[in-house]
A protein has these predicted regions:
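Helix-loop-beta segment of a Rossmann-like dinucleotide-binding subdomain
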Residues: 88-105, 236
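A conserved FAD-binding loop/helix module that cradles the flavin
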Residues: 312-321
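Glycine-rich FAD cofactor-binding loop and adjacent beta-loop-alpha segment at the N-terminus
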Residues: 4-81, 98, 102-109, 158-159
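C-terminal helical "tail/cap" subdomain of flavin- and related membrane-associated enzymes
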Residues: 2-4, 328-381, 385
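Active-site flanking residues adjacent to catalytic metal/cofactor-binding acidic residues
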Residues: 9, 32, 163, 301-302, ...
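Short FAD-binding loop at a beta-strand-to-alpha-helix junction that anchors the flavin cofactor
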Residues: 295-309
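Conserved FAD-binding catalytic core of PHBH/FMO-like flavoproteins
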Residues: 116, 130-134, 139-284, 288-293
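A conserved beta-strand/loop element that lines the FAD pocket in flavoprotein oxidoreductases
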Residues: 121-132
């Protein structure tokens, strides 16, 4: 029996992982990606350069045979290192077992490895520089614009899976066609990435095997280690208000904020002001959508279905779990795609909404529990809740 061909929108993290699962089951897959091939061109996605990989994501990478390779380039983080205002630190271990460790991984390297893994199956092709403009779910037709020439092309599909992120065009088509429930909830806070570089003798400046957190009430700073001995820091901060991205603008503003709220970081970040002023400010929002499919034709996974605030990697791990669950359902129902899509949408919607809620709760708890030492223990959540 000939296997149907799948069309996937988006070659970020979820897309090529799902393609590998499908290829292992004998399906041919064509992925359309709006960006150039990052393995050939240096591109910026405007997003975190490292992510926290936990048990949900680890299990998925094991299933496609990529975990050991990724682990070799990952840094284990055995707990949260809480930084008080006075410079004191408190390590909160995640646990004693190996699966209670999370890993700092490079988004870019992971993305490239996932694409290469998918292509090596011989059943997956990736068409870069193709931006989806619209989807006609009745006619099974997609319209793309070539980002390097502005030419528009049409492509037909049999089954299409949207892995195209929080601004998903396929989700828009499904919502319009099904009157699906859809809400995008802005958090009112944004984020900006900063850097703690290696020391002069090319070593880590702070403890590498921990996820560092500076909770400060209405805002917070976190830092994850990189394999080049640097740390990627993320400042979660109000978008508007008296102390916000709207008001912290000048060199004086930036230094005042960090010297008063994160004093132990200033000496570690020689390019603090430059990074703050030049790096983009990302917004924080959660996406709630239901259902995630249209008939047996179209399905959403990952951020396209359930975007969450970018907080300690829930998005990636939950997206990877989506791929694993869908793979299991394909095995369970064979080629009954109506049953597969229905079951996936029914079971995963609740999980997706729960993870989105949990991400916000974690963020609010972590940033607000600053002056209460008792709360630090309270915040040591089980690793299977994605930290």
């Amino acid at each position: 029996m000939n296997k149907e061909k799948f069309t996937l929108i988006g070659a970020g993290l979820a897309g090529p992982l799902m393609a590998s699962y499908l290829a292992k089951k004998g399906y041919f897959v064509e992925i359309f990606e709006q960006r150039p091939d990052m393995r050939k061109e240096s591109i910026s996605a405007g997003r975190s350069i490292n992510l926290a990989l936990s048990i949900r994501g680890i299990n998925s990478l094991k299933e496609v045979g990529l975990y050991e390779k990724i682990k070799n380039h990952a840094i284990p983080m055995k707990g949260r290192m809480i930084h008080d205002l006075d410079g004191k630190t408190h390590l909160q271990p995640y646990g004693q077992k190996e699966d209670e460790t999370i890993f700092s991984v490079s988004r870019g390297k992971l993305n490239m490895d996932l694409m290469t893994l998918a292509e090596k199956t011989g059943k997956v092709s990736i068409r870069f520089n193709h931006q989806l403009l619209s989807a006609d779910l009745d006619q099974n037709e997609l319209i793309f614009q070539l980002t390097d020439s502005s030419e528009e092309i049409k492509s037909s599909f049999s089954k299409v899976i949207g892995c195209d992120g929080s601004a998903s065009i396929l989700r828009k088509a499904i919502v319009n066609k099904t009157n699906a429930n859809y809400i995008k909830k802005p958090l009112g806070h944004g984020y900006k990435e900063l850097t703690i570089p290696p020391s002069k003798n090319e070593k880590f400046q702070i403890e590498p095997n921990a996820l560092h957190i500076w909770p400060r009430g209405k805002y917070m700073l976190i830092a994850l280690p990189n394999t080049d001995f640097s740390f990627t820091c993320t400042l979660f901060f109000p978008m508007t208000g008296e102390t916000s991205f709207e008001t912290v603008i000048t060199e004086k503003d930036v230094l005042k904020l960090f010297q008063s709220q994160f004093p132990d970081t200033v000496k570690l970040m020689p390019t603090l002001v430059e990074d703050f002023q030049s790096n983009p400010t990302g917004d924080l929002a959660s996406v709630y959508c239901e259902p995630w499919h249209f008939e047996n034709k179209a399905l959403l996974i990952g951020d396209a279905a359930h975007a969450v605030v970018p907080f300690f990697g829930q998005g990636m791990n939950a997206s990877f779990q989506d791929c694993s669950v869908l793979n299991q359902l394909i095995g369970q129902y064979a080629d009954d795609w109506t049953a597969i899509f229905n079951d996936f949408s029914t079971t995963q919607v609740e999980n997706g909404h729960a993870i989105a809620d949990m991400a916000i709760e974690n963020y609010l708890e972590m940033r607000d529990h600053v002056n209460n030492p008792v709360s630090y223990t309270h915040l040591t959540l089980p690793t299977n809740r994605e930290v």
